[in-house]
Amino acid sequence: MKIDSLKEKLNIFKIPLNGIKLIEASAGTGKTFTIVLLYLRLLLGIGEKKIYKKKLLVHEILVVTFTNKAKEELYIRIKDGIQNMYLTCINKTTSDSSFQFFFKEIHDIKEAIYVLKRAQNDMNSSSIYTIHSFCQHILQLHTFHFNDIFEEKIIENEDNLYLQATQDFWRRFFYTLPEDIIKIIYQDYKSPDHLLKTIKPFFYIKSINFPTKILNNKKLIMYHEENIKKIIFFKEMWLIYHKIIQKTINDLEINKKIYSKFNLIKWINKITEWAKSETKDYTIPSILKYFTKKNIEKNTINNTCSKYIIFEESEKILKKKFSLKNVIIIYAVKKIHQFLLKEKKKKSLIGFNDLLSILLKTIKKEKFLKDLIIKKYPAAFIDEFQDTDIQQYKIFNLLYKKNKTTVLFLIGDPKQAIYSFRGADIFSYLYAKSKIKKYYYLDTNWRSSINICKSINFLFSQNINPFIFKNIPYIPVVPSSKNLKMNFTINDVAQTPISFFLQEEKEVSIDDYQVWISKQCANEISFWLTCAKTGKAKITTKNGEKILTANDIAILVRNRKEADLIQDELEKLNIISIYSSNKNSVFQTLDAQELLWILESILEPENEILLQQSMASHILKKLSLVVENKTISNKNSYFIIEKLYEYHDIWEKIGVFQMIKIMILEYQKNSFCTEINENHIKNLNFLHIGELLQEQFQFFHKKISLIRWFQKKISTKTQPEYNESIKCFDESPSIKIITIHKSKGLEYPIVWIPFSIDFKKSTLAIYHDQKSLKTFFDENYSNKFLKIADEERLAEDIRFLYVALTRSILHCSIGLACLIKKIIKNRNNSDIHQSGLGFTIQGGKTMNYEGLLEKLKKLSINNFIEVKNNTDNFSFSRKPQTISLICKNKFLNKKNIRNTWSITSFSQLNKINKLSKHHQKEVALKELCIKNQEKKNQSLLTIHNFPKGKKTGLMIHYILKNLHVLKNKNSNWFSCILEKYNIHIKWTSVLIYWIKNIINTPLNDEKIILSRIDEKSSIRELEFFFPIKNMLYSTELNKIIQSINPTSITSPQLSFNPVKGMLTGFVDLVFIWKKKYYILDYKSNWLGKNNNFYSSIHINKEIVKKRYHLQYQIYTIAIHKYLQKKLKNYNYKDDFGGVFYFFLRAIDCPKKNNGIFYTMPNYSLIKKTMTLIS
């Protein structure tokens, strides 16, 4: 591949308008404006009369970009450009120097006015597309001309299809494999989701070269058996030589500190023990490295041991990386791809990438279509060309490469190619560049201040190849003279354009660094805003001088986790922030659940359960307050039901969306939030969901079908469709937190980049051949190809850094530390040279803290860059009226909903922020005890070593839910249940025996037995809701808990955010026995190896530790409130029988009464808790 092309600074009026032209536009150099000016040249025919016989019309100029947002921006900018040029021609002058210069090139003003006016009128027929909409348009054109039928439905987001395909692959192929192989696979892939996350990059890479041909389970098993044979062969060889190895090594002049007598005996014994064991997996002892030829020669004086074959074999077996990981990747990619093709064909679906493949094949095959496109679009622009892939490039290259009467502009910036995760391929760009003799570049920066431009120039001029690849050069930008006065000042002192915040420690872990830099970032922003309050922090931009506000500051991150870290620190200092890259589905908000309750109630207004659910929603808060009143009147009930019938009629007549709008308007006056902003957000979400429901209703005949679709959307946790993401409400001053990916193309006066030194080394050996630029995958994960893959990862990290830095107009603060990814004894150097920022500063060399500090000092000598260590802790105080913004911010960042209405449960209240060290140790010891016990009792199947965990608890609850039909169930039914919950069917007889004992064990002296409870006298899994009217605080609830059970003072305190709204839960069983109502809760907790561990002493300890006394208090309140409404002369002491907690693992014999806990909650405490809550 040719490395260097000739380069020339772009002159808009001199660049020829024929052939393929590549223009590289660095960040801030006016790429879009360049497209506008070239577009105007084509419209007005300036300079190219020989090539184009007539001036081009707007529909003849093709403009292609990669996102809808970019398409909309281009449309607006081109339309505005035409308007401005039109006004310039009318007025014969303009204040814009570019248009004034353009005006001088026009010879016939009247003709130009006519052309521009026509272009303005024709803009609705302009040919501005995304790459995928362009493909779709051409294929439809092909359909028209060839009477072909293009019936496929285009899907924009294929994530759910990929997941479905992966799950299908997982079931079909993994479930049928031998257990030994499944265990090996499970070490690398825990679930279909995990597998998909690993292999997804392969689906974006076209024409990847796979070396292996394992395409079925039979070949996979053979491959596994070959690996096992190699390991067995080595083991046998070791057992032959192991007795003479110690003597052989001792006879060498070897380093006795490492190869001491003690170490040799210990190592040899461990390896020998392994060699004698059965070979079921690919485990190789790491200590075998001491017996490799290379290591022994390294530690001997004469450097020779070549005559000993065992040392050579040790080296070979360690080099051979035994794994199924890479084989599974290739196997899965091919099978899942086949499944996708089959599924798409079956459902007549087509993905965006399929459009590209189809169009490329069609153009290659049919010359008529190719000629038709060229005739239709004699000029074309490909915007953001650095984000292309090989298929996209081939399409446009085929169309325009040999045509001298057309022009194709490829415009982009390879330094900003950061979208490899979705298929963009920088190597396709480099390939295109290698085919072009001369490329043009833009170098005037119109965005940033002079000092920012100089500092970024200086930073990226430190290395010969700052972006690693030689054909991605850094051309220093020239700041526009118009930006001379642009500045950021505090107390009238100009701030250094780039500040590095360096943590003063020689070794820093990523976790410690993230905590430290988050605080530094929040503290500095707090300081700026505090200064701004007194008018001491100012910014001067193109629009003049103004006081700094939160809106002027952006924090750039890679992902949601980093955003959360920053938001938490900002919140501590009372600073409002919005995470602009929120991609959560609107269906996963509390508002969606509330709206579902309301719609369900509208369909069945007289259904009491649905009515009460809908009253839990904020939008019907006023009505719910009436319903919750104990003295509810028939008149009020009638009014509520009438209102729901009214909404039903509106829905019937004008649709669900209009009905939701009317409902919102009616209840707007009954504000359900402390401030209007949160009210606005909630309304925004309701309307958003209303639009989606209205759109979906066209596919259903009945309202109930729409409700079921809505229910499924809420319950299914999948990636949101393009139109389902939460719409950000962004009107008030707030710090913008945004991902670097999403920030591309945007600009901010002040930028913070806290986490620029973090990196993830490449774990997939996907790499490009530097000559052919083809993509390969090395299944053996050899160091050579992993190194190439990681170099490509590092190159993109540097491009990430460039994109992040160039978002800033006036100032950029960056975090930095001597990051150590893996602690190694006596290690001096950090790992940051493997990050984009570390490479740029250190030139790719490893350095310690002192070396890094020295480099930073050299960078800071010209006053463009400064180094800081710590910021003071400022707490930024807001004005009272901005409280509403907190509400807004918390809503948009769902993990931090505070001081707002919500639905909670015992489980949520019971969550502790951090376990004490003592408790962590206790849990760890218990888990170890369980594992050891399991190992000892593997041959003996009892309820005490029955599989543990959540799935077992769910299974037992499911079985006992079917209590009254268990008598009719045979062993096959129980086996099916075990399989359903992924538990081996060998436990069938144990399970049957266990369940039989459970349902026949007396709960007390009155002989309450589950099997004797009448079905009509019980309710299973009773769901309850009751309001928390007063704000509930954890401190107050802790006092109640301690008064219920004084020993609970020894357990960790509850710690939750103040909550108000609804308390919900499920009671396993409520039943009547001898005219009294009882609560029963099943507990599948494992407390010990036999029945003795379920004595009253042990159970009471478990009750305290898990805070079950709070749980049964809540359950009792729920049933008490329920019975108050249902029974006329209800009395707690006379009608309520108490609470049973049934510890099921104790029930190994019906005659023993261990495992049963009973209590009759104190009525005064019940009242006290009820008063606290409501």
From Swiss-Prot:
Keyword annotations for this protein? ATP-binding, DNA damage, DNA repair, DNA-binding, Exonuclease, Helicase, Hydrolase, Isomerase, Magnesium, Metal-binding, Nuclease, Nucleotide-binding
Residues annotated as binding Mg(2+) are: 957, 1068, 1081
Manner of cofactor binding, per the entry note: Binds 1 Mg(2+) ion per subunit.
- Xref: CDD domains: RecB_C-like (cd22352)
Q: Which positions are catalytic residues?
A: 1081 (for nuclease activity)
Q: How does it assemble?
A: Heterotrimer of RecB, RecC and RecD. All subunits contribute to DNA-binding. Interacts with RecA.
| Gene behind the chain | recB
Q: Which Pfam families match?
A: UvrD-helicase, UvrD_C
Where are the annotated segments for Nuclease activity, interacts with RecD and RecA? 900-1174
Q: What is known of its domains?
A: The N-terminal DNA-binding domain is a ssDNA-dependent ATPase and has ATP-dependent 3'-5' helicase function. This domain interacts with RecC. The C-terminal domain has nuclease activity and interacts with RecD. It interacts with RecA, facilitating its loading onto ssDNA.
**Gene3D superfamilies, sorted:** 3.90.320.10, P-loop containing nucleotide triphosphate hydrolases (3.40.50.300), PCRA, domain 4 (1.10.486.10), Recbcd, chain B, domain 2 (1.10.3170.10)
The residues the record assigns to binding ATP are 25-32
- The EC number on file is 3.1.11.5, 5.6.2.4
Q: Which organism is it from?
A: Buchnera aphidicola subsp. Acyrthosiphon pisum (strain APS) (Acyrthosiphon pisum symbiotic bacterium)
Any idea what job this protein has? A helicase/nuclease that prepares dsDNA breaks (DSB) for recombinational DNA repair. Binds to DSBs and unwinds DNA via a highly rapid and processive ATP-dependent bidirectional helicase activity. Unwinds dsDNA until it encounters a Chi (crossover hotspot instigator) sequence from the 3' direction. Cuts ssDNA a few nucleotides 3' to the Chi site. The properties and activities of the enzyme are changed at Chi. The Chi-altered holoenzyme produces a long 3'-ssDNA overhang and facilitates RecA-binding to the ssDNA for homologous DNA recombination and repair.
GO MF annotation terms = 3'-5' DNA helicase activity; ATP binding; ATP hydrolysis activity; DNA binding; exodeoxyribonuclease V activity; magnesium ion binding
Cofactors per UniProt?
Answer: Mg(2+)
- Similarity comment text for this entry: Belongs to the helicase family. UvrD subfamily.
Q: Which GO terms describe its biological process?
A: double-strand break repair via homologous recombination
Name the catalysed reactions. Answer: Exonucleolytic cleavage (in the presence of ATP) in either 5'- to 3'- or 3'- to 5'-direction to yield 5'-phosphooligonucleotides; Couples ATP hydrolysis with the unwinding of duplex DNA by translocating in the 3'-5' direction; ATP + H2O = ADP + phosphate + H(+)
Q: Where is this region: DNA-binding and helicase activity, interacts with RecC?
A: 1-852
> Mind telling me which GO cellular component terms the entry cites?
cytosol; exodeoxyribonuclease V complex
Q: Which superkingdom is the protein from?
A: Bacteria
List other remarks: In the RecBCD complex, RecB has a slow 3'-5' helicase, an exonuclease activity and loads RecA onto ssDNA, RecD has a fast 5'-3' helicase activity, while RecC stimulates the ATPase and processivity of the RecB helicase and contributes to recognition of the Chi site.
Q: What InterPro entries is this protein classified in?
A: DNA_helicase_UvrD-like_C, DNA_helicase_UvrD/REP, P-loop_NTPase, PDDEXK-like_dom_sf, RecB, Restrct_endonuc-II-like, UvrD-like_ATP-bd
Domain (UvrD-like helicase C-terminal) ranges: 479-745
What is this protein's name? RecBCD enzyme subunit RecB
